[in-house]
Amino acid sequence: MYYLQMYEKVLINTNITRPYLARFTKYQYLCHMIFYFSGTGNSKWAAKTLASETDDKLVSIPEVINKDCSFTLEKGEQVGFIFPIHGWRVPNIVKEFLTKLTIKTEAGDTPLVKHYCFCLVTAGDSIGKAMERFLQQLKSTTVGDSLSLEAVCSLIMPESYVGLPGMDVDKKEKELEKKELASKQLKEFSKIIKQRYPLGNKQIWGWEQLKRGPIPSFFSGPVGGFFERFLITDKPFHVDSRRCVKCGICANVCPVSDIKGGLGYEPEWIHNGKCLTCFSCYHHCPHHAIDFGKRTQKKGQYFYNKLSK
């Protein structure tokens, strides 16, 4: 089980396959968990689907990252991580979460006992060497003393990054094709997680099958560094007042609370350095009133439950 100390919200289990949020509950005990982050819904779909198969409980990283949280696992319990790839690297919010995450084992465990851990990532095309970077950070943080990464998976999902020329959402046919293939791969991965299939020789299941793409070291290295330094920013975001209806959706879907606004107000980006450039605000705007400089003009929108035009 795990112990999560929170002061405003905690996850509670009211249905074995449907975790919900409750306010004003201080303590809650749950077991097997999946930590997930999602911007436009691809990773959230994967997390919810996998949790329904494995009976894992979902923990939203944006919901807990600013809380003082601590987790205790009993013998045999597992942990999963699910998130999208940003610029062929691990998203900043996930990297920050790993540095804050504390997992303790039950009193009877020895320091040599590690809990089963898996990681699933989503991307529109390829992941480069993002999984290598995730594993490296996992091992370098305190939580790595308690977890052993045993299975990995990469799902190629519909495109959502629209921040550069030539990058746009997929056509409807391509979107459906990616979703269909991802569903099959996720079902296979869920079987592996439930069986905890042992490979031996310190191998990680699915490692060789990851969709790294061409020259992965280059994309996760220099290109990824360029993304983090120059393209992960909220500065180019702006709203067209002629189309904005002040619905507040953009502020509500921002995973890092970087948008000041709400019902009755136009969005105002706070520039607090937390923006992930996940484009959740852009894609969820019902009137397409948000743009990222001039780079998103005449481009499409996408989030998981909405088919591209």
Where are these regions (language model features)?
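Short, positively charged and aromatic/hydrophobic N-terminal segments
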Residues: 2-3, 7-12, 19, 23, ...
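Detector for intrinsically disordered, low-structure N-terminal pre-sequences
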Residues: 9-11, 21, 58, 142, ...
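Residue-level preference for short coil/turn positions at secondary-structure junctions
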Residues: 28-30, 74-76, 112-114, 233, ...
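FMN-binding flavodoxin-like domain, especially the glycine-rich phosphate-binding loop
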Residues: 34, 38-46, 52-65, 73-83, ...
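Acidic, Ser/Thr-rich low-complexity intrinsically disordered segments
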Residues: 215-256
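Iron-sulfur cluster-binding cysteine motifs and their immediate structural context
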Residues: 239, 245, 249-276, 280-297
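Active-site-proximal loop/hinge segments that shape catalytic or ion-binding/gating pockets
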Residues: 302-307
